Amino acid sequence: MKKNPIYLWVLLVLSALISSMSLFGILSPLPSKDALRASLANSGALTAQQLEDTVNYTYKVSESSHSIFNMLLIILSAILVVVAFVFLVRKNVQFANYTYVGYVLLAIVGLVYSYMNVQDAVQLIKDSALGLGMGALAKGTNILFIIINVLFLALVFYKMWRQQKDLTEEVEAEEAA
């Protein structure tokens, strides 16, 4: 390809930032319930039951983010981002696109896994209003991120289609000449 795929550079930089934050998240230690309770107790806006529910919810979500499956997803996604960068630097846009598509599909799998874990954590909340709010927030966040990933996927597929179409037109023009 003659053109520099700026769309892919932008998507990969955003993905690299997300992957690095996820890597730092799994490298940080799992907080204890006492530490969570102490940090939330200073807010003063929660009742004793809400405080305990929030501690249990936060601990369960943190625990699931440190699971082996989640760690494998994060490490694999970081590797895919690095590989896509390498392909892009070497001007192999097609393989960079394929690698990025793999990354996005893996990210969607990670979002579904995260959503299922958050729904399990919401079951620990006894306060119905708090549980409803946290469940709705988790659902909304996951839906938003899945939509963003699908849009990224659509953009990459569109660009791949355009690149193939341009390449076909170039070959036809050369054959006609």
What are these regions (language model features)?
Residues 33-67, 114-143:
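Interfacial non-cytosolic loop connecting adjacent transmembrane helices
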Residues 142-150:
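Small-residue-rich transmembrane alpha-helices that serve as helix-helix interface/gating elements
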